[in-house]
Design a protein with these regions (language model features):
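Perimembrane helix-loop-helix junctions
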Residues: 184-213, 278-287, 328, 334-343
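Membrane-interface transmembrane helices that cradle and orient dolichyl/undecaprenyl
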Residues: 104-105, 109, 145-166, 193-196, ...
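Extracytoplasmic
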Residues: 60, 180-181, 185, 224, ...
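Hydrophobic/aromatic-rich transmembrane helices and adjacent perimembrane loops
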Residues: 132, 138-141, 146, 183, ...
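Membrane-interface alpha helices of multi-pass inner-membrane proteins
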Residues: 118-119, 161-179, 185-190, 213-214, ...
Length: 491
């Protein structure tokens, strides 16, 4: 019995180490999504002394932006830094998920093998792999949700307030990084109250609530400085203005909600999780306390899915927060099926088969993204823009260019997704928002020494070809400089 167990220990850590290395390499070489760029720009603005909401529009929870800003203050203002720490957080979430199964699954011969399957089912998930290492809050939320789950499971069997308070703090950190993860907070609190086995449940609930509140101190601070701005960025923008950039939003949302049918990974993971949940409820014979932990996975997955599904518009990556919890249930489902079809104490082949299927699904996703834009292309564009733009001159560009050139955007240009917001002028000024008409007026008045765009329609609408003497085309993008006699750029 010693040899296979030692072998599975090596396999457990070996497989997860190989995954972690590959994931880190991907994060530094190819990971990119356009939406991460305004998160990076927000971190850069924070380093310049500006406050989210108060000094610039940033319709996101602020904690992840402060996290990125802190690490960039130590290691430099580079997307490589943000990607590295997001990747490490995602790897941490995968390890927490795999380790939970390896420790808590009641069938000894399946603990380590199932842990490998569960960890790789989560880590090789296409959405987790593609979005986990980005500067957005995905990595932060994956890690804090997985950690809050682990702490909550431990807290119900122990007296005292420390573990519940820590669980609330970590769950609050997830919500403070992205409100898409906020649904986990009431689920964890309710579950701890219902299944508490030691100590005063009300004291624990109070500790959890206080911990959550502590995580929201940055939001409370910003609210005290600008309640109107904070309300707009965290609530009003999402309720009334997000859909401005997505026509036929309802149809789009329905297509996203049905897209799992076309995903082999989602189908496999979901079916295994469903079988796992049924096995826990009807066939396992496990102790009620252990069953409750797996039920918690189901409740978290359901609540987080509902939260992501009600976003308007929603996107497939919003659902990646459920992956660790669905993967745990899928590990149970894999055992339930394999133990009936194959030898119950020989998990090697089922684990290899499922891992291979998830790896193939990820491979297909990465192959389909092979021609997508990435940071290397923007670095070339930023270098040319720096070459032709005088220091401290005004630049008309988008978030990735502002970030890479380290040129602060003019007021109102910090978030390109805000120009369609239609509010009274005084409100727009308070919220640091300018309209598309105001953007056009500034560009055509000669306010910018250099202009950049990758959109032919925008180039024509702004009249950039007639405003500048010089033009350079790089890929699908164009850089304009050397203003004609229409005005001089503002200092």
């Amino acid at each position: 019995m010693q040899t296979p167990r030692r072998g599975w220990y090596l396999g457990f850590w070996g497989a997860l180490s190989v995954y972690a290395a590959a994931f880190l390499i991907y994060s530094q070489a190819w990971a990119f999504a356009w939406d991460e760029t305004f998160h990076l720009l927000a971190a850069q603005l924070i380093l310049a002394g500006k406050k989210p909401y108060i000094d610039f529009c940033f319709p996101q929870s602020p904690l992840n932006a402060y996290w990125n800003a802190w690490w960039m203050s130590v290691w430099g203002q580079s997307w490589h830094v943000a990607h590295a720490f997001s990747a490490l957080l995602t790897i941490g979430a995968v390890l927490l998920t795999a380790d939970y199964f390896a420790r808590r699954f009641p069938v000894p011969s399946w603990r380590l093998a199932g842990g490998v399957a569960v960890g790789l089912a989560a880590g090789l998930n296409a959405r987790v792999f593609v979005f986990g290492p980005l500067a957005q809050a995905y990595g932060m939320c994956l890690f804090t949700l997985a950690l809050a789950f682990r702490i909550s499971v431990r807290a119900v069997g122990r007296s005292g307030w420390l573990l519940p308070g820590l669980a609330g703090l970590v769950a609050g950190a997830a919500a403070g990084s992205s409100l898409l993860s906020a649904a986990a907070v009431p689920v964890l609190l309710a579950w701890m109250c219902i299944y508490n086995r030691s100590g005063n449940r009300w004291l624990k609930s109070a500790a959890f609530t206080i911990g959550t509140a502590i995580a929201f101190v940055p939001v409370f601070r910003l609210f005290s400085l600008g309640p109107r701005q904070t309300w707009f960025n965290l609530v009003q923008y999402h309720v009334f203005f997000r859909e401005l950039y997505w026509p036929e939003t309802t149809r789009h949302d329905l297509e996203v909600l049905a897209s799992w049918i076309d995903s082999g990974q989602a189908l496999l993971l979901g079916l295994l999780a469903l079988f796992g949940l049924l096995y826990v409820a009807r066939r396992s014979g496990w102790a009620p306390a252990l069953k409750a932990e797996f039920y918690l996975c189901a409740w978290l997955a359901l609540a987080l899915s509902a939260e992501a599904g009600r976003a308007h518009p929603t996107f497939p990556q919003y659902f990646l927060f459920i992956v660790p919890f669905v993967a745990i249930l899928a590990g149970v489902g894999l055992y339930a099926i394999s133990s009936r079809v194959l030898e119950p104490d020989r998990p090697l082949w089922p684990v290899l088969l499922v891992t291979a299927l998830f790896a193939l699904g990820l491979g297909e996703t990465l192959y389909n993204r092979r021609d997508d834009i990435w940071w290397g292309r923007y670095k070339v564009l930023a270098a040319k823009i720096d070459q032709v733009t005088p220091p401290n001159a005004r630049l008309y560009a988008d978030e990735p260019i502002y970030f890479l050139t380290r040129r602060l955007p003019p007021p109102g240009f910090e978030l390109s997704y805000s120009h369609k917001v239609n509010l009274p002028p005084a409100e727009r000024a308070r919220l640091h928002i300018i309209t598309e008409a105001e953007v056009k007026q500034q560009v055509q008045s000669g306010s910018f020494a250099t202009a950049f765009s990758c959109d032919d329609d925008e180039i024509d609408d702004l009249g950039l070809k007639s405003l500048y003497n010089q033009r350079a085309d790089i890929g699908d993008c164009a850089i304009f400089w050397d203003l004609k006699a229409v005005g001089r750029p503002h200092p």
